[in-house]
UniProtKB/Swiss-Prot annotation:
<dbReference type="GO" id="GO:0016157">
    <property type="term" value="F:sucrose synthase activity"/>
</dbReference>
<dbReference type="InterPro" id="IPR001296">
    <property type="entry name" value="Glyco_trans_1"/>
</dbReference>
<comment type="function">
    <text>Sucrose-cleaving enzyme that provides UDP-glucose and fructose for various metabolic pathways.</text>
</comment>
<dbReference type="Pfam" id="PF24862">
    <property type="entry name" value="SUS_EPBD"/>
</dbReference>
<feature type="region of interest" description="GT-B glycosyltransferase">
    <location>
        <begin position="274"/>
        <end position="750"/>
    </location>
</feature>
<dbReference type="InterPro" id="IPR056736">
    <property type="entry name" value="SUS_EPBD"/>
</dbReference>
<dbReference type="GO" id="GO:0005985">
    <property type="term" value="P:sucrose metabolic process"/>
</dbReference>
<protein>
    <recommendedName>
        <fullName>Sucrose synthase</fullName>
        <ecNumber>2.4.1.13</ecNumber>
    </recommendedName>
</protein>
<dbReference type="InterPro" id="IPR056735">
    <property type="entry name" value="SUS_N"/>
</dbReference>
<dbReference type="Pfam" id="PF00534">
    <property type="entry name" value="Glycos_transf_1"/>
</dbReference>
<dbReference type="Pfam" id="PF24861">
    <property type="entry name" value="SUS_N"/>
</dbReference>
<keyword id="KW-0328">Glycosyltransferase</keyword>
<comment type="similarity">
    <text>Belongs to the glycosyltransferase 1 family. Plant sucrose synthase subfamily.</text>
</comment>
<keyword id="KW-0808">Transferase</keyword>
<dbReference type="Pfam" id="PF00862">
    <property type="entry name" value="GT-B_Sucrose_synth"/>
</dbReference>
<dbReference type="InterPro" id="IPR000368">
    <property type="entry name" value="Sucrose_synth_GT-B1"/>
</dbReference>
<dbReference type="InterPro" id="IPR012820">
    <property type="entry name" value="Sucrose_synthase_pln/cyn"/>
</dbReference>
Length: 803
């Protein structure tokens, strides 16, 4: 047998050198085309377009070998003639950086700081050799376990539980931290589960065995109150269960854990921990339950209200199952707006509909001049948040009669406030970005100075950076948000390395860290349910829906008319901004003659009644009017103002599904999750949605819906044409996709699954914080310094609102 020889793996530069020698002319021709366009950033889809414009024979040579691998996996090219630098992503979370001198055909490998420095030269006022602040969080995480298998990404707490269990629990004495964790569980000064009689692990095991023996002798349904006194005498108090059966299950779970600490048993036991005071931060925008129609009051408000009801339901169930008679409290903390404009936003405390113990607590923004009365865009809240945090802290203590157990941040402003509050109170923090604006607005980091007057991204990106690194765990709705896919960069992954020229460079913000956990939400199934459930249908809304869609009248609620109501409908409903790309969908439709022959287009977005206060929405409305005129859309197109009645919106989806021919489209340039995608699928309406972000994961292409590429409008329009032509020829095709969507939702996207998982994550995280160095004190000191020396100045530089 021939001897096996180990060979060295060649670096990317070495492999490229070989390809450059073999295909010199073809590579020079391509790179010359790219630098011929002048300095700038060339995105992945633009690079691919340049390659596709080359004759096929030449293209095949280019794409074979190392250079082809680089082109396919390059996410951007920085063009500064004669140099082209490439950020290459061979797989999720792995990045390499090179630059090529097109004239000399020299290839150099770059470290992250070198690549970012080169990129900064695109911008006037580059560093010119001056010292630049570089942020690197990697040294703080060097000894911390990191997931390497893709299946562990997004299951961070589960991964951490496995790792730390193996490290910490090796004998009976090492179980003492678990005993201590149980002993600190109390409610209003009263112990839960254990009293002071139990002082060590041996005593705990002895007591649990005695309890187990007794419980096996009585009826499973025996209420806890019947044996409460007997348990108190041996050191056990309320919190184990409401019946003998429930108590026995918990006690046996703990006995198994003490005997042989297995991670899944530990997670199951800790998952039953009780968290009684939960605070959910959402400072910006109008946050109310009725009549909120501003650009910042979209999916996040709906998400939080549904989240709160699901969490309360799960918390009450757990409290009952554990035999406790205590009251949980959930507070949604947001702005109080004296100028409430017909809403309840000026009311300090408001009970959440359908809940017993959840309230909206409103605290105003204030300055030295007094309370800020008017609504402020989410991009302009930064100078108010530090004072706001102090005021919120006082209100929480007053309202809860103590500290919260868990603080959940939402969006950038809610996450920075949650970080400050969690730091102040020393409690568990969870963050949820919903959307990271750096991902939504390409090149908003490198060209931040151009955008800062309008968007103040320097403050926002810095707040995001602080919150991500301070929080105990991060929840995302999809894997895509964390690490993307083979072809798409993850929302968080894009924050690993970036630069804000003149401010700082981030050379290693965060890795694919165990703090990331996928916890997908669902739609409110009392509102969004399948069109086939006839007995639940809200037919009383049908006359109003009929008028919205088909009335020949144009007014302040709807513009343009549908002349042929027998055609199926492409339906879309979203905020009217550039990222949601509603005008992009309208343009695709306007340009495709066959699509216009087959179907009508109905758009629900923006406010036709009054002028928007949001600059981006104003620009999109102007663009929409231009498209209607350019493509003569009246007769095939209907533009309806944003609809705030969620209950009627659910019936609107079902009404369109009744035709067994329509569909819902989500054409966003980027969608962090895609709640409207889940809502439409839950109603049984086939859904086409962007392949950029969460919908790429929610939808299984061709089975439960279809992906569309917002950067290739012609292809997206053709995909729609193909679907409608196939459905016209075979109506069962529509039914098959509708059913596939419903099955996908019930498997993965419900609020019941969400609330169970979130509370389990909280329990496991709190335990490991208590018994290990999970709070990462060293990095928090680094963050404190960065907050005080950099973020505070940026936030103070944002102009205060003019009232």
């Amino acid at each position: 047998m021939a001897e096996r020889v180990l060979t060295r793996v060649h670096s990317l530069r070495e492999r490229l050198d070989e390809t450059l020698v073999a295909n010199r002319n073809e590579i020079v021709a391509l790179l010359s085309r790219i630098i011929g366009k002048g300095k700038g950033i060339c995105r992945n889809h633009q690079l691919i377009a340049e390659v596709e414009a080359i004759p096929e024979a030449t293209r095949k040579k280019l794409l074979d070998g190392a250079f082809g691998e680089v082109l396919r996996s390059a996410q951007e090219a920085i063009v500064l003639p004669p140099w082209v630098a490439l950020a290459v992503r061979p797989r999720p979370g792995v990045w390499e950086y090179i630059r090529v001198n097109v004239h000399a055909l020299v290839v150099e490998e770059l470290r992250v700081p070198e690549y970012l420095h080169f990129k900064e030269e695109l911008v006037d006022g580059s560093t010119n050799g001056n010292f630049v602040l570089e942020l690197d969080f990697d040294p703080f995480n060097a000894s911390f376990p990191r997931p390497t298998l893709s299946k562990s990404i997004g299951n961070g707490v589960e991964f951490l539980n496995r790792h730390l269990s193996a490290k910490l629990f090796h004998d009976k004495e090492s179980m003492h931290p678990l005993l201590e964790f149980l002993r600190v569980h109390c409610y209003k000064g009263k112990n839960m589960m254990l009293n002071d009689r139990i002082q060590n692990v041996n005593a705990l095991q002895y007591v649990l065995r005695k309890a187990e023996e007794y419980l096996t002798t009585i009826a499973p349904e025996t209420p806890y109150v019947k044996f409460e006194h007997k348990f108190q005498e041996i050191g056990l108090v309320r919190g184990w269960g409401d019946t003998a059966e429930g108590v026995l299950e918990m006690i046996q779970l703990l006995l198994v854990l003490l005997e042989a600490p297995v991670p899944c048993t530990l997670e199951k036991f800790l998952g039953k921990s009780l968290w009684l005071n939960v605070v959910i931060m959402s400072p910006h925008g109008y946050f109310a339950q009725d009549n909120v129609g501003y650009p910042d009051t979209g999916g996040q408000v709906v998400y939080i209200l549904d989240q709160v009801r699901a969490l309360e339901s799960e918390m009450l169930l757990r409290i009952k199952q554990q035999g406790l008679d205590i009251t949980p409290r959930i507070l949604i903390v947001t702005r109080l707006l004296p100028d409430a404009v017909g809403t309840t936003c000026g009311q300090r405390l408001e009970r959440v509909y359908g809940s017993e113990h959840a309230d909206i607590l409103r605290v105003p923004f204030r300055t030295e001049k007094g309370i800020v009365r008017q609504w402020i865009s989410r991009f302009e809240v930064w100078p108010y948040l530090e004072t706001y945090t102090e005021d919120v802290g006082v209100e929480l203590i007053k309202e809860l009669q103590g500290k919260p157990d868990l603080i959940i941040g939402n969006y950038s402003d809610g996450n920075i406030v949650a970080s400050l509050l969690a730091h102040k109170f020393g409690v568990t923090q969870c963050t949820h970005a919903h959307a990271l604006e750096k991902t939504k607005y390409p090149e908003s980091d490198i060209y931040w100075k151009k955008m800062d007057e309008k968007y103040h991204f320097s403050s926002q990106f810095t707040a995001d950076l602080i919150a991500m690194n301070h929080t105990d765990f991060i929840i995302t709705s999809t894997f895509q948000e964390i690490a993307g896919s083979k072809d798409t960069v993850g929302q968080y992954e894009s924050h690993t390395a970036f630069t804000l020229p003149g401010l700082y460079r981030v050379v290693h913000e965060l890795c694919i860290d165990p703090k990331f956990n996928i916890v997908s939400p669902g739609a409110d199934m009392s509102i969004y349910f399948p069109y086939t459930e006839k007995e639940k249908r809200l037919t009383s809304f049908h006359p109003e829906i009929e008028e919205l869609l088909y009335s020949p009248v144009e007014n302040e609620e709807h513009l343009c008319v549908l002349k042929d109501r027998n055609k199926p409908i492409i339906f879309t409903m979203a905020r009217l901004d550039r990222v949601k790309n509603i005008t992009g969908l309208v343009e695709w439709y306007g340009k495709n003659t066959r699509l216009r022959e087959l179907v009508n287009l109905v758009v629900v977005a923006g406010n036709l009644e009054k002028e928007s206060k949001d600059n981006e929405e104003k620009a999109e409305m102007t663009k929409m009017h231009g498209l209607i005129e350019t493509y003569k859309l009246n007769g095939q197109f209907r533009w309806i103002s944003s609809q705030m009645n969620r209950v009627r919106n659910g019936e609107l989806y079902r009404y369109i599904a009744d035709t067994k021919g329509g569909l819902c489209a989500g054409p966003a340039i980027y969608e962090a999750f895609g709640l409207t995608v889940v809502e439409s699928m839950t109603c049984g309406l086939p859904t086409f949605a962007t392949c950029k972000g969460g919908p790429a994961e929610i939808i299984v292409h061709g089975k439960s819906g279809f992906h569309i590429d917002p950067y290739h409008g012609e292809q997206a329009a053709q995909l729609l044409v193909d679907f409608f032509e196939k459905t016209k020829a075979d109506p069962s095709h529509w039914a098959k996709i509708s059913l596939g969507g419903l099955q996908r939702i019930h498997e993965k996207y419900t609020w019941k699954i969400y609330s169970e998982r979130l509370l389990t994550l909280t329990g496991v995280t709190a335990f490991w914080k208590h018994v290990s160095n999970l709070d990462r004190l060293e990095s928090r000191r680094y963050i404190e310094m960065f907050y005080a020396l950099k973020y505070r100045k940026l936030a103070e530089s944002v102009p205060l609102a003019v009232e």
